[in-house]
UniProtKB/Swiss-Prot annotation:
Record-linked Pfam families: UxaC
Biological source species: Cutibacterium acnes (strain DSM 16379 / KPA171202) (Propionibacterium acnes)
SUPFAM superfamilies in alphabetical order: Metallo-dependent hydrolases (SSF51556)
NCBIfam families: PRK02925.1
Protein name in UniProt: Uronate isomerase
Amino acid sequence: MSTPTLTLSEDRLLPRESSALAAAREIYRSTKGLPIISPHGHVPVSWIADDMAFSDPTSLLITPDHYVNRLLHANGVDLEDLGVGRKTMSEEDNRRAFRILCEHWRDFAGTAMRYWLVDQLIGIFGITERPSPENADRIYDTIAERIAQPDFLPRALMDSFDIAFIATTDDPCDDLDGHARLAADETFTRRVAPTFRPDKYLEPAAGGWTGLLARLSEVSGCDATTLDGFTEAMEDRRAYFRQHGAVSSDHSHRDLGTIILDHDRAASIFDASVAGRATVEEMALLRRHLFTDQARMASEDGLTMTVHPAVHRNHDTAAFHRFGADIGSDVPVTLEVVDSLHPLLDKFGNTDLKLVVFTIDETLYSREIAPLSGWYRSLYIGVPWWFIDAPESVMRFKHAVTEMAGFSRVSGMIDDTRAFCSIPARHDMSRRLDAAHLAELVVLGRLDLDEAVEIAHRLVVEQPTQVFGL
């Protein structure tokens, strides 16, 4: 019996009706070859700075991809068997992990993960066999042979993927050595920027907060154990990040609550939090005040402020204690935006601030986020991420926001991934869905084809360039 083949239709995700398909093909062709701009993601800078060969298919395609890991876990796989939380994996361990993926291939049917994996297997590695227990080792060997070649080093992939700009995610106290080395290397022509991620420094109720303040004090040279010193330290580190090419900060709190406390009240709560005397309610107020002050800083220093709220992080407590964060056990929660952001937008909504609001609560797009972005100059709509970046939910997003906010108020494509080889697949999917949506408008007589082509280009290039100040 012959092995079933993997297929990758040239017209995947494009509309089936003939006139819409013709328009979508032309629109997609106009953006297919454009460089990738990736303003928010989680690829380690060390991969690119050190330019070391990827050691094996598992550590490249499986272990860092929490999209893949979470579904395998749901179907009975121990994350440790996928390399999660392990410092070393033997060759047999890596093969076993890859066999597990192939054994569970059917569990990915209909998911975005399968779509991206197929694109990677065919488009990057030339694999045309559908993964199965029988061919797992053969596919593993093909990928292993491919990644051992010089043209598969990370910097070479940056060129072959045509990634013009990519952002990493970094702690405010990071020295950004990898970014500095890349910037100083005249042979490296791509752009890799850090992203300022201060979440845990703004959460006085979180464990270890005072230890973080001590570290921040050490790195910045400011006494971060007082409100004024903390503010100075944050401004110092933001400036350091900008000097190393940063264009944005990223924030992920449970809610979007904002407030501007008077200085004495904020300082008093800050002091009480450092001393361990603040109430839960006071610490929540302080966190919202500190978060709002990041918007004030952004309006002054030019870093675009992105927010990824409404996630119950580390929902599986036992898995968190065993493996740590960012393993895929997060769960969406509901969110309220209009009232929560009102203090911030009332102060900074029509200033030079650029605020990109993401959500994984789809109900918010047409009810709250799109109407806000249709008024406030500072607010942009973040494209779907995490649980809602599959083709179906992306199209729902486009229909929900375009009718009231148009195309000029969206962030442009954000892949938000740790899976390096999935970046081309994710951006290609986005361009195909742009083409499908725009073709609908052309067929309905709401756009001319030349306008649709221009908008598609804008969504890929001009929009992220403008929103992130590239």
